[in-house]
Design a protein with these regions (language model features):
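Residue-level recognition of specific faces of alpha-helices
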Residues: 27, 40, 55, 76-79, ...
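Short, glycine-rich, amphipathic interfacial segments at transmembrane boundaries or analogous
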Residues: 39-76, 110, 138-166
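A short, structured surface patch at a secondary-structure boundary
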Residues: 72-132, 136
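C-terminal terminal-structure detector
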Residues: 128-197
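Intrinsically disordered, low-complexity boundary segments flanking structured domains
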Residues: 23-27, 41-42, 116, 123-129, ...
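Conserved catalytic core of Hanks-type protein kinase domains
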Residues: 30-31, 86, 98, 143
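A hydrophobic, helix-centered structural microdomain
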Residues: 1-61, 174-197
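Positions in alpha-helical segments
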Residues: 11, 39, 78-82, 114, ...
Length: 197
């Protein structure tokens, strides 16, 4: 209950405060390339319910339906998208998802269905027992995930075999130990990581 009130408060006032920035970003995206302002993609949320996540579009619109993994300096990424991705600004519209109850500020990142299928059953059920988050400890530790995957001959296999198990460990650690102070710590560490890259 406290966590949900925390999410509601910060997502509501965050969206109000960030509205001018959102307008500027929307204009930049539209001027930079053809297509929509937002990128919507199906993700698996609380109790396995599918929802469409909100992100600022960072790739050519013709590539949107193909996106599962983005590796290194992907040629599909727009000029505005490079900046938005570097500072994780493309994730800010997920405050909408937090406000409507599909996500939380902090929690396991929501995956696409094909990667959820790779989760061991006992792990999957536990991870899907909480709302997915905009940020978490795995996102902080693996902030350069795309660059790491670029080094592998088969990035998709590397993601499933190497990256996912690491993420799952951090997801479970969070679920087993989460409290409001841990959420505040993760939010602080997220900003610190973004602005010291």
């Amino acid at each position: 209950m406290i966590k949900r009130l925390f999410d509601l408060f910060f997502s509501f006032f965050g969206l109000i405060l960030l509205t001018p920035l959102f307008i500027l970003i929307a204009l930049w995206i539209k001027l930079d390339s053809k297509g929509s302002i937002f990128f919507r993609q199906e993700r698996v949320g609380l109790e396995g319910v599918i929802f469409k996540i909100h992100k600022f579009r960072t790739m050519e619109s013709s590539s949107e339906n193909q996106v599962r993994l983005t590796i290194g300096n992907d040629s599909r990424i727009t000029k505005s998208g490079q900046f938005l991705r570097k500072y994780k600004i493309d994730e800010l519209p997920q405050l909408i998802d937090v406000l409507i109850g599909k996500m939380s500020l902090v929690g396991p990142r929501p995956e696409v269905k094909e990667f959820i299928k790779e989760y061991p059953l006992e792990i999957k059920d536990k991870i899907l027992s909480v709302r997915p988050g905009i940020t978490d400890m795995a996102s902080i530790i693996m902030v350069n995930e795309n660059e790491v995957l670029e080094k592998y001959k088969d990035p998709m296999k590397a993601y499933i075999d190497i990256v996912l198990p690491i993420k799952q460990k951090h997801y479970l650690d969070y679920i087993n130990n989460h409290n409001i102070w841990l959420d505040l710590k993760i939010i602080f560490l997220t900003f610190k990581k973004i602005f010291t890259r």
